Amino acid sequence: MTVRFFAASLLAAISAPALGQAAPATSAQAPATQAELVPIAIETSLGRIIVALDKTHAPVTTANFLHYVDTHRFDGQNFYRAMHVGDGGLIQGGITTDARKLYAPIAHEPTSQTGLHNVAGAISMANAGAGTARSDFFILASDIPALDATATDPGFAVFGHVTEGMGVVKQILASPVSPTKGEGAMKGQMLEPQIKILKVERVNP
């Protein structure tokens, strides 16, 4: 997964007409079934973000993320992108410097299947199309329903939600960006300096 591909798909997904017409979702969790949640902590240079991964509704995506967590492959990586959408937006991080740390791409779990939604606090996988997600992920600071799956667009797979640390998410989103780095739609969205991910680990519920 490359930053460039995610930029193109995301730009198409959040075009102004789509954002203007979509009704915002109200919950990052599927309400119909009790979820088995796996809590993890993302320790950053700006503070801690606690995320509950939804093993019940997004088992493939959760297992993939935990594979990276349990093998410490996120440790020392960065949040490298802050994309503003209206008064909110999203922050993106993952493995961008060493392809040897990447595992194989995973099957896509669309929001139409999981019942999870791209709302404030949701964690989702970046992708270059269905079945291409690997390590890169993003956390939403606001509802962006246009990132959910539709009949013609697989969207982005949500697999959990922030339970603590939204202040840190918003602080990263508000951090300085380079006016020149980034290609195409990514220009002006690359954090400078990047925000260090010190470690990611499982924590007790």
Task: Describe each region flagged by the PLM.
Residues 3, 19-205:
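Cyclophilin-like peptidyl-prolyl cis-trans isomerases
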